[in-house]
Amino acid sequence: MYKRQIYPDHWGRKNEHQDKPSKAFHDRWLNRLKEVVDNYKPDYVWFDFGIRFIHEKYKKDFLSYYYNKETEWGNEVVVSYKWHDLPPGSGLLDLELGRESELTHYDWITDTTVHDGSAWAYMKNSKYKTTTDLVHYLIDNVSKNGYMLLNIGPKPDGTIPEEDKNLLEGIGNWLDVNGEAIFETETWDQYGEGPTKMNEAGPFSDNRAKLIYTAKDFRFTTKDNFLYATALGWPSKDFTIESIYKLFDNEIERVELLGSADKVEWKHTRDGLHITRPDNKPCEHSYSFKITRKESL
C-alpha cells in the first residue's frame, strides 16, 4: 500500500514537502489492512517503501491486530518491512534484490525475481536467471539466517510462462533431494567457507555484482544433531571442509550425501573433515553432505 501523499502520481514526481498523512488517511490505511486480514487471512503481509510516514500508534495497532490472528487462526503469520520502517524485531527485514554478506543474529528475507534483472512482471524476450543461480541464492540466504521470496510474472491471461515453470520445477527437484538441509534448519557457528565472497550487501546489491560460486564454496545449516554442509558445485573426488575441524574424539558418527545410497568415506582431523565423495551425482546445482554428530561427548 503506497503512500499517495508522498508520491501523488504513484511513480511520478515526489512531494518534496513530504506532508504528514492526516488522521483520515491513517484511519483509512488501518481499516483497509484490517479488511484484507479479515477477508483473506493472509499468511504474509509485505510492505514496500512508504510506511515510515505512518504514525507509530497505527503501526502498533496493525501489528497487534494481525499478530493476534496467529492464535485465532492457528498458523504462523509474518510481516516484512524495508529499511527502518518498523522497529527491529517487530517484523522481518526485507532486502529487495539483495542479501546479507555475513551470518546475522536477526531474521531477514530477500525478495527477488526469476528475471535476470529487476523485472517484476511478464516481459517478452526477457532474460532469466538459471536454476543454479536461484538454488545457490536460496542456500546462501538460509545459511545466513535469511529466506528467499521469489517472484514470477504471469502473462496477461494468467498463465505461467514455460521459462518460469521450468525454473520453479528445477528448484523443486533440487529440494526433493536436499530439502532436509533447508527446511526447519538453523544456522551454524558460521555460514560457510570458500573463495567466493560478497563485496557488497544490502538492498539492490544483486544489481551491482553477480557471484559465480565454485565447488570449494560450502554453506552450513543444522538440525538436531545433524550438520549439513552443502557444496555449491560438484567437489573433487577427495576434498576437505576446513571449518569442520576436530575438537574432541569421536565427534562425528557418520557422513552421507543426500540423495545417494553410496557410502561416503571420511576422516576427521584437526585440519578439517576429509571426505571422499561417491562417483555419481544425486542431483544438479548443489550437493548436501549430512554429518551426524554424537548427541553427547
Q: Predicted segment positions?
A:
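Mature catalytic domains of secreted/periplasmic carbohydrate-active enzymes
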Residues: 3-297
